[in-house]
Regions:
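Active-site gating/metal-coordination segments in enzymes
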Residues: 81-85, 89-91, 95-183, 240, ...
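Catalytic pocket-lining loop regions of alpha/beta-barrel enzymes
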Residues: 174, 178-266, 273-274
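Histidine/acidic-residue-rich catalytic or RNA/ligand-binding cores of hydrolases
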Residues: 29-33, 76, 102-104, 194-203, ...
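Active-site gating loops and adjacent loop-to-helix segments of metal-dependent hydrolytic enzymes
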Residues: 23-47, 55, 98-129, 149, ...
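Short acidic/histidine-rich active-site segments
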Residues: 185-188, 244, 270-293
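Mid-to-C-terminal alpha-helical segments outside catalytic/metal-binding sites
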Residues: 2-9, 298-336
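Alpha-helical scaffold segments that flank or form the walls of functional sites
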Residues: 17-21, 26, 34-89, 129-148
């Protein structure tokens, strides 16, 4: 099975248990560079995140993938502290976010002010090879001079058409994936109309040399229902999916349609390519740094206490849940 790089070092994939594959422990929407994590944020994470993370073990979940890119992350030591105190495996990302290149995308997120961009300024200043070197350094040597190493590469885009800086970041991520053997996990924008294309991301990554079997296309929950042809095309080419932003309350007909789409993918032989995450975050999207503004409580464990019980009522089986949460992450997260 191989080993997975966590913030406390390598862990055998057989020890991961269930894995929630796309979360955020510290998401600073206004950061322009990575600096010191304010002590009040660390206190919030100690008081609110750690109890929720400990509860994950009650459901057989021993691993969380933090998909937060530069410069939105906390200091590396914060993740190591959370992992130790929650006794949880945390896989931390390296990588770059998308550009807030149109006011609509910023206002959709509920942010009170409109910045120039979300993307790390080094993407504009450095060439593709230097950016790839930075990603590889964080994976193989450590993040910001620490011994905390990244275990996955995060990339993001806003629309089907990439901005020049988004394309540059994707090319750097593809180079880093080839050099490290780690998976790429992406942000396919799920909230703006028309829906962004996961195929466009896969096209660019493949053209830049990435292995499609090491690509996880993220936030594709609405695509399962509305763009099933695009989803199937990505799966046919070897990619995996991360289905996120999951809720248990309200709109039963829609969530039943999501579960039906997942079960059809199992029937078509693609059950080994599916993963789940909430996209839960402690963040400052509305100004102050607080609990997630777009997902219900409780943090992280909501997937197990609310979503999966409801989805099982809609027909998802225990065997399918085990495949999605245990076997698939154990295959995807080790470097190859």
């Amino acid at each position: 099975m191989g080993t997975v790089m966590t913030v406390l070092g390598p862990v055998p994939a057989s020890e991961l248990g269930a894995v929630t594959m796309h979360e955020h422990l510290h998401l600073d929407q206004y950061a322009e560079a990575e600096g010191t994590t304010p002590p009040e944020r660390v206190a919030l994470l100690r008081d609110c995140a750690i109890p929720a993370l400990r509860r994950l073990h009650d459901h057989g979940c021993h691993t969380l993938v933090d998909a937060t890119p530069m410069p939105m992350r906390a200091e590396p030591w914060v993740y190591a502290m959370l992992a130790r105190e929650a006794n949880l495996h945390i896989v931390l990302a390296t990588g770059f976010y998308r550009e807030a290149w149109e006011r609509e995308s910023w206002e959709y997120a509920g942010c009170p002010t409109y910045p120039h961009r979300w993307m790390d300024p080094r993407v504009a200043a450095w060439d593709v090879e230097a950016l790839a070197d930075l990603l590889v350094q964080e994976c193989e040597q450590g993040i910001r001079g620490s011994d905390v190493r990244a275990g996955i590469i995060k990339l993001a885009s806003t629309r089907t058409a990439f901005t020049p800086l988004e394309e540059k970041a994707f090319r750097a991520g593809a180079l880093a994936q080839r050099r490290t053997g780690l998976c790429i996990t992406t942000h396919v924008e799920p909230g703006l109309e028309p829906l962004a294309s996961p195929v466009a991301q896969l096209d660019l990554l493949e053209a830049a040399g990435a292995d499609p079997s090491r690509v996880i296309l993220g936030h594709v929950q609405p695509h399962l229902v509305r763009l099933p042809g695009e989803v199937r095309q990505c799966l046919d080419r070897g990619a995996s999916l991360c289905i996120t932003n999951l809720q248990a309350e309200g709109n039963d007909s829609y969530w039943r349609a999501v579960v039906d789409a997942i079960r059809r993918l199992f029937d078509a032989g693609f059950g080994d390519r599916l993963t789940l995450g909430l996209d839960w975050a402690f963040d400052n999207v509305t100004g102050p740094f607080v609990s997630c503004s777009w997902m219900p409580l409780p943090p992280y464990v909501y997937l197990f206490t609310h979503v999966l019980p409801r989805w099982k009522e809609f027909g998802l089986t225990d065997e399918e849940v085990t495949q999605i949460l245990v076997r698939n992450p154990a295959r995807l997260l080790p470097r190859v």
